[in-house]
Amino acid sequence: MEKKKPRTLVEKIWERHVVRRAEGEPDLLYVDLHMVHEVTSPQAFEALRLAGRRVRRPDLTVATMDHNVPTTDVRLGVRDRVSARQMEALRKNCEEFGIQLHEWGSPGQGIVHVIGPEMGLTQPGMVIVCGDSHTSTHGAFGALAFGIGTSEVEHVLATQTIPQRRPKTMAITVEGEAPPDVTAKDIMLGILHRIGTGGGVGHAIEYRGEAIRNLSMEGRMTICNMTIEGGGRAGMVAPDEKTYSYIEGRPHAPKGRAWEEALEYWQSLPTDEGATFDKEVVIDAAELVPYVSWGTTPAQTVPLDGEVPEPQNEGHERALRYMGLRPGTPIREIEVDTVFIGSCTNARIEDLRAAARVLEGHKVKEGIRAMVVPGSMRVKKQAEEEGLDEIFKKAGFEWRNAGCSMCLGMNPDILSPGERCASTSNRNFEGRQGKGGRTHLVSPVVAAATAVMGRFASPSELGVPVEVG
């Protein structure tokens, strides 16, 4: 009998989901979960309507409102007309096509990449798609998850399949234990600093190594979330006991015999010994530190203890001009105007707990605008049950409702021109948080300490132990 070739995690999932293969054409993959939001879906539903088609598997399609929603009181309504139209369109489309919608302000509403995992919808071995580039977040569970365009959203709605060319494979191994003050966000910023914004183009990336295995599921979600910032098509972590424990008992998790069968499948997914990748990168976790982005890409980062670097090319010079920074300036001397804790990268309960531990007993520096936006209404409720909201409010933070918020300039939470923000989000492009806004990417604990000091700071400056969890 011929010995089977060792396979990677992505290869195993891919082969299981191919429903049609033809020479010279993309493979046609079956989709296990399609997540929908108000921004990239209206045209797709309208195209279905014009063609007289139905949604093939509404039971495998879940919708929420997140990108455009105001994060203040729902009773105040939506003032922006475009946002209001998109939200109303999603309501009507979900009702017409029989899709479950987590309405703005409802108990299940939140950022699409937060609610999927917390409801147990996201599971190992699945193919998951959404009209959003940070769909790679779900890969933390050992799923093949990637963002798609509006025309592809229509295709999935109509057929529950998607044509895709198989990506190359890439392994990023973070060896050893990370220092106690290094968070998942710092690990990912360190990876991006190493590989750049194009290092993963055309690849499905599997994150491996002791430092990755040591992360909680929420930490792994932070890692996989920012895969697209390195150019990767998908980011994945092989499932293990942490994965199974996180899923078990959640609303959409398998039950009884179905759980045992699912577990058997999930345990077969990790990359086989001897399997090879098209590209490999190895990083020593001991060399990682807390990072702050200085420029206008997530790869333009330096250590918190470092300085704004000398420009190496015209792109760096443009970034420095836009950010209003001078080379040689110590990062810890850069003052901020705003602090934002939120987004699909860092707005889960562990992120909020970590930030609250830093803030307890401290006050936001006068003149600093600071806000916390939970990733979902479930996260908000849990945080309030734990008293985290009181810690944030006593410190001087605004405590908001769930939504994408200041991660992107598509809702009322935006920066003014020249306003400098320490943000736990995933992108720092020009104008990402509002025209002329200056975004620095940081971890939740650095964001919290920065709010207190009014400049970039670490928790240790406030007397908080360096072990950040």
UniProtKB/Swiss-Prot annotation:
The family database entries (Gene3D superfamilies) matched by this protein are listed as: Aconitase, domain 3
GO molecular function annotation: 3-isopropylmalate dehydratase activity; 4 iron, 4 sulfur cluster binding; metal ion binding
Name its GO BP terms in alphabetical order.
L-leucine biosynthetic process
Which HAMAP family does this entry report, sorted A to Z?
LeuC_type1
* Binding residues annotated for [4Fe-4S] cluster, in chain numbering: C344, C404, C407
Question: What keywords tag this UniProt record?
Answer: 4Fe-4S, Amino-acid biosynthesis, Branched-chain amino acid biosynthesis, Iron, Iron-sulfur, Leucine biosynthesis, Lyase, Metal-binding
Q: What name is this protein filed under? A: 3-isopropylmalate dehydratase large subunit 1
This protein's assembly is summarised as:
Heterodimer of LeuC and LeuD.
**Chain's role:** Catalyzes the isomerization between 2-isopropylmalate and 3-isopropylmalate, via the formation of 2-isopropylmaleate.
Q: Does the keyword 4Fe-4S apply?
A: yes
**Which pathway?**
Amino-acid biosynthesis; L-leucine biosynthesis; L-leucine from 3-methyl-2-oxobutanoate: step 2/4
Asked if the keyword Amino-acid biosynthesis belongs to this entry, the reply reads: yes
